[in-house]
Each structure stands twice: as structure tokens, then as C-alpha cells.
């Protein structure tokens, strides 16, 4: 399953560029959630500006990429859209996680 993952931390909710995003091929939702967790943890660690327990601040959304769109095509478009625009163009509307 090809998915788009938008990972961030809860304090800023992805504002100020404090987020990560990627298009990945996963076997199931468990694997997608593992990617989301690692990506969100990477966001928090990269900014090194949170004193509280970061575990509670890790958040991510997972969307299924529309049929007929390749990983390469979707990945190439990431920098051209914000999350909402990318989802509208390349993803099914339902949030999987």
C-alpha cells in the first residue's frame, strides 16, 4: 500500500516548518504507524527544543495515495504543495491514522 505520511509534534502542529513528510510503500497500517512514529520523533529530536516528555507530543496522519500514482511521481510533488494541497491532488480523502 502506498501512503503519504505527515508527521509533526503536538505543540506547534506542523507550523513553522516543524514537520516531516514522505511517501512510502508499506505492508500494513502497523508498518505505516511505525514510520509515522519515527518521523515524528525525528522532528522533535532535530529541533531539540522540548523539555517535556516527547512521547505525548508525537503525532502523524496517514493517507492512502490514489490508484495509478507512483511513489516517484508523488514524492517528486511533495515540495510543491502544503499538506492540504498534496492530499487533495494525490490522496484519497480519508485519514487512515
Regions found by a protein language model. Give the residues of each.
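Short aromatic-glycine-(Arg/Gly/Cys) micro-motifs in beta-strand/loop hairpins
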Residues: 1-20
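A broad, low-specificity signal marking well-ordered, structured residues that form hydrophobic/aromatic
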Residues: 4, 24, 60
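Generic structural motif
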Residues: 11, 29, 65-68
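A short, exposed loop/beta-hairpin motif centered on an aromatic-Gly-Thr core
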Residues: 16-30
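Short, conserved charged micro-motifs
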Residues: 31-36
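Short, mixed-charge low-complexity intrinsically disordered segments
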Residues: 38-97
